A protein has these predicted regions:
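Rossmann-fold NAD(P) dinucleotide-binding segment
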Residues: 51-116
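Hydrophobic beta-strand scaffold residues
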Residues: 27, 47, 116-117, 158, ...
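Rossmann-fold dinucleotide-binding core
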Residues: 4, 96-176
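NAD(P)+-binding Rossmann beta1-loop-alpha1 motif at the extreme N-terminus of oxidoreductases
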Residues: 1-64, 89, 94-95, 125
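Amphipathic alpha-helical hairpins
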Residues: 11, 15, 53, 60-62, ...
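Helical "substrate-binding/catalytic lid" subdomain
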Residues: 166-269
């Protein structure tokens, strides 16, 4: 039985961490908001007061954090992993951030003997709880191969995508793709309804076409049922990372940029 650490027990992280416990691992956890960790503690997880304390109490550290600054703080800040004097020296980070940040943190932590395996998770909170996430990992292929049991506890589609930071690129790319698809479906359904075809009929058509996918049907289910579940949207952040990199690479992305603006407007209102 391994002892794993998990940092970040929000909507996605709590589900991922719970599945590590279900797989038979001991778990030590931390989060800035202790109340988010109560559910995991009731399942046997042990709460620690800092990333440093987590690292010193486990074999491998995992994390799911919301922002670049959070990842930098966990790795290099006060009470961060870089201060750990024993325990884990492998950090598997699933945070939705940009490539530049994880590569920069790795450059500093490697001086302390740490290895980072960069990950990203595709799916919503329900998939995290069910252990059916798509997981993309990058960094050392040997380290990836050695820790399949961790990944299989949290996801059912696991793909290695190359050099460190590529998993973040994949996450940003998937966010950009999803943003454009969301808007296209919404506009198309409004147009069809005005023309006399119901959203439900269009959903059936999509499910029996080459455009069918789990993601598209999930969006269509919401449109048809009109059951819009309010949840924090990370779309502008994740799409924004992709657009920032596009500007640096001088790659024009007008449709993605428009989708970014529409999601930003929705979030602001």
């Amino acid at each position: 039985m391994a002892t794993l650490g998990f940092i970040g027990t929000g909507g996605m992280g709590s589900g991922m961490a719970a599945n590590l416990i279900k797989a038979g691992n001991k778990l030590v956890i931390t989060d800035l908001r202790r109340e988010q960790s109560k559910g995991l503690e009731s399942q046997g997880a042990v709460f620690k007061d800092s990333p440093k304390a987590v690292a010193e109490s486990c074999d491998v550290v995992c994390s799911m954090l919301p922002y670049n600054q959070a990842v930098q703080a966990v790795g290099l800040g006060k009470g961060g992993l870089h201060e750990a004097t024993s325990g884990a020296k492998l950090w598997i980070d699933f945070s939705s951030i940009d490539k530049k940040t994880i590569v920069g943190v790795d450059a500093e932590l490697s001086k302390k003997g740490w290895t980072i395996l960069d990950g990203s998770a595709g799916g919503v909170e329900e998939a995290a709880a069910a252990g059916t996430l798509s997981l993309w990992l990058s960094g050392s292929k040997a380290v990836f191969d050695q820790h399949q049991d961790i990944f299989k506890a949290m996801g059912n589609k696991i793909i290695f995508v190359g050099e460190l930071g590529n998993a973040k690129l994949v996450k940003n790319a998937m966010a950009m793709f999803a943003a454009v698809v969301h808007l296209t479906l919404a506009e198309t359904c409004a147009w069809l309804k005005k023309g006399g075809l119901s959203e439900d009929t269009f959903r059936t058509i999509l499910k029996n076409s080459q455009q069918d996918s789990v993601a598209i049907d999930r969006i269509m289910e919401i449109i048809v049922s009109k059951k819009y579940k309010p949840r924090k949207s990370w779309m502008p952040k994740d799409v924004g990372f992709g657009l920032d990199m596009a500007r640096e690479m001088e790659v024009p992305m007008p449709f993605v940029a428009l989708a970014y603006q529409m999601f930003s407007i929705a979030q602001a209102t």
